[in-house]
Amino acid sequence: MTNHESVKWANSGLDLHLELGAGGLRTALEDALRAAIRNGRLPRGTTLPATRVLARDLGVSRGTVLGAYTQLAAEGWLRGRRGSGTVVAFDAGAEARLPAEPQRRFRYDLRPGRPDASSFPRADWLRALRRALAGAPDEAFDYGDPRGREELRRELAAYLRRARGLRVAQDDVVVTSGYTQSLGLIARALAPCRVAMEDPTMPHHRAIVAAAGNEIVSLRVDDDGARVEDLEDAMLVVLTPNRQHPLGMTLSAERRAHLLDWARRRGSFVVADDYDGEFRYDGRPIGPLQGLEPRHVVYAGTASKTLAPGVRLGWLAVPQTLRDRVVEQKQLADWHSGSLEQLALAEFLRSAAYDRHVRKMRLRYRRRRDVLIGALAGRRVRGAAAGLNLYLEVDDEDALVAAAAARGVAVQGAASTGYFAGAPAPGVMVGYAATPEHAFRGAVDAFAAALASVTPRSSAPRG
């Protein structure tokens, strides 16, 4: 344990100043704590006061403090430590290793995981929102069901059965505010436990799981996906089985069978993150793990890739034995997601506008992918069959990221931003969705020039 992990609140000399805004006291407290952690006034390992004590000191209700602590734990800033209360989990000194918005303005955005915001279906969404608002019952404006609006859960269940092949009913669906919250709910519902996570994976996701008080063990990946045969006594496994993020391979049929057999024998759960599953361009669609074993697989989906990250809605298909615990954590986090947004998405799904938009964007992203692959001919490329980005294996990712930045292109290195828990393998994630249509070819040309300036062509691309 390092020195800064034993810091006590009483020794920090910290005063919290709450700036009241439209979000109220709880939001003000969350903002104040985030700021204190981010700027280092509350180092990692600092033990925060008990909720009752801080509520008394600040002159707010205990529920306000509890709600703020719960939300920040879900976001990875705090974690509950048995016998030691709530402690700071985020390390401000390591923030540079996490994926972040570029510190400068780039002409072209080729970072991963971002859809084309300029293609958001504004007219269709506005139409759905108007219909939802006009038809909303009065109780839709009151506190609602933590599971989500019945209208949306019904439409999501129908969509997931039809389009994604799930074995799911309305009562299995829990609506969340996106995958970040979904993962936090499950991590806290099972905490404290041992959680197996892919290596590499998003560092933010590791932070969320750890913040809930869980022990993380890493699962190495190879060309057949996560090495699930290495699983031991974990209670939870978090995977991107259909398209491993960031490397892009698919979990093989043999390993899927091994994983599900393991989960049945041990009574464990698997989170299958289907973060960009609607966008497959080559080969047949891959069936979901949940469709094979709904008693042990939690399916996680989100509107962030199909519509936009600003539509803060996600969904879980949760096994019956885990459902009550997940719903309880959702209620503790924020009670329920926004009712009007839920009703709008329900109408969007019901009217088939969602399907039309996904089909349109799938064709557009496929064309972009083809352009990018053509520019990268002779390079070591992974993950080309699906998704919103490629993984380009390089010898010096920092040099390539810098060369791209010099040409106004934002890309993201994997090793340098903390994706690897073990020995890092250099590579750059190149997104082809976020850049507007009119600028995409210019972005590809600029990135290809950056790549040519730092590394020669080598082996052929890999799918």
Spell out what each predicted region is.
Residues 139-266, 278-298, 365, 396-397, ...:
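Conserved core of the PLP fold type I
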Residues 215, 269, 409-410:
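Residue-level detector of anion-binding/catalytic polar loops
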Residues 113-116, 241-245, 305, 435:
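Short glycine-rich anion-binding loops that position phosphate/pyrophosphate groups of nucleotides
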Residues 1-132, 136, 141, 152, ...:
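N-terminal basic, amphipathic alpha-helical segments
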Residues 47, 199, 204-208, 259, ...:
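A generic "structured core" feature
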Residues 293-325, 337-340:
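Active-site PLP attachment segment
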